[in-house]
């Protein structure tokens, strides 16, 4: 059997150069892209940035503030000094999927790109996985175990997280690298808890939905199929309009 080598990176879809670089490295590569409802994806993405490092990737813990700050950040203001991927703070760009998918279609051809929806994966993970196996030319009639992984997590004690993140380098050097790694791993697990993500504010939902809803038809045309979040986005704008009329 011929082995399949895979690589998964978070920002390859967002990157303007990744598609051409992958093509250069592996001309016959097959690309798998998973897309999610922008409302859900951006809320989860923001929570992950906040969790990654206290104040480093995203110091604005309120997603509404982070969403509004994007306009200023794109002209060089309110940028966290220690953020690792500046474009990760451009929420509107992150979930504008059409130009991103188009780059891969244009570079590899549509037949070499498999786009799957998170909604389908959540509803039937096994069948979605088999679809991917078929695309890769792998045996797909196999038993699959698809447990839920990577639930939403939060930091129990932010003060502990801050202290660990700001230990002086001179003090760190007193201890072996392996021991430091074990310490961070153990403390990190103790200081982390699984917590359901709170409901997004209805007005914020309306604002985000109003931005992405008009962009959904272009994605549908590109992919040649219906987009599962088209109606939910439209409904999110209408629900808040109804609330406003009642008030």
Region annotations inferred by a language model:
Residues 1-247:
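Anion-recognition interface
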């Amino acid at each position: 059997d011929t082995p399949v080598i895979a690589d998964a990176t978070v920002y390859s879809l967002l990157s303007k150069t990744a598609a051409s670089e992958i093509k250069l490295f592996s001309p016959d590569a097959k690309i798998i892209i998973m897309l999610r409802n922008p409302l859900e994806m951006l809320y989860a993405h923001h929570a992950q940035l906040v969790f990654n490092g206290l104040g480093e990737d995203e110091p604005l813990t309120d997603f509404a503030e982070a969403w509004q700050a994007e306009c200023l950040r794109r002209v060089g203001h309110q940028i966290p000094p220690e953020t690792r991927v500046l474009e990760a703070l451009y929420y509107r760009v992150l979930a504008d999927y059409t130009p991103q998918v188009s780059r891969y279609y244009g570079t590899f051809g549509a037949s070499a790109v498999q786009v799957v929806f998170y909604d389908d994966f959540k509803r039937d993970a096994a069948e979605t996985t088999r679809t991917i196996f078929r695309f890769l030319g792998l045996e797909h009639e196999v038993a699959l175990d698809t447990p839920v992984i990577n639930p939403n997590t939060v930091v129990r004690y932010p003060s502990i997280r801050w202290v660990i993140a700001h230990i002086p380098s001179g003090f760190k050097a007193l201890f072996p690298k392996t021991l430091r790694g074990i310490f961070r791993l153990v403390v990190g697990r103790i200081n982390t808890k699984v917590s359901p993500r709170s409901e997004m504010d209805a007005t914020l939902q309306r604002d985000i939905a109003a931005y992405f809803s008009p962009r959904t038809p272009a994605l549908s045309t590109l992919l040649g199929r219906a987009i599962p979040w088209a109606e939910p986005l439209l409904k999110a704008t209408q629900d808040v309009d109804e609330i406003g009329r009642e008030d």
